[in-house]
């Protein structure tokens, strides 16, 4: 039995609030159960040096966790003087995932930065950041069209992500902290709306896991992500 009493394939309740802040071109608060992540997408008319003059755009991301997003206060990384390895790994994952959603050639020499700030963490913060960040990215691209910066949105497809794992011997989808902290296997999966795989991060926490268990987790992830894409599109079509 899962601590949340959910079935193995069941996602946590999701809530998506668009236009959450006033200044960002795309702004989304995504809530996956008790995990809450603010995703702001900002448009810039410049690109990294390695892309200048090539007529191609870029999507990047930053990730941070508020000091009291967790049960015990964590020091701000700015106060430590550098970002931690976990933070760098996560924001690179978010950026890679979101770039798969966009035709970078059609974006022109523009850059979109998606800032993902965890307000409250209860497991699955990086996957929530990707799912919410893609909606914020879509809104930012639509803003560019409305402002005449693009003729049409270069968004190719929606991208979403979910965690899966083995908890008490059973593969389960969308782990919260109570499950994640006791899981035998912890896996993050990023997929396109058409089912294409972008990234699989799978780690055994307590001994090895089998090929069959991996396939079972990927099957759960596919179903979970399909449900998330439905919610993404529902949110984008809400106005």
Swiss-Prot record:
The keyword Transmembrane helix does not apply. It catalyses: tRNA(n+1) + phosphate = tRNA(n) + a ribonucleoside 5'-diphosphate. Phosphate binds at residues 86, 124-126. One of its GO terms (molecular function) is tRNA nucleotidyltransferase activity. Its EC number is 2.7.7.56. It is an enzyme of class 2 (transferase). Keywords: Nucleotidyltransferase, RNA-binding, rRNA processing, Transferase, tRNA processing, tRNA-binding. InterPro entries: ExoRNase_PH_dom1, ExoRNase_PH_dom2, ExoRNase_PH_dom2_sf, PNPase/RNase_PH_dom_sf, Ribosomal_Su5_D2-typ_SF, RNase_PH, RNase_PH_bac-type, RNase_PH_CS. GO terms for biological process: rRNA catabolic process; rRNA processing; tRNA processing. Homohexameric ring arranged as a trimer of dimers. Belongs to the RNase PH family. Phosphorolytic 3'-5' exoribonuclease that plays an important role in tRNA 3'-end maturation. Removes nucleotide residues following the 3'-CCA terminus of tRNAs; can also add nucleotides to the ends of RNA molecules by using nucleoside diphosphates as substrates, but this may not be physiologically important. Probably plays a role in initiation of 16S rRNA degradation (leading to ribosome degradation) during starvation. This is Ribonuclease PH. The gene is rph.
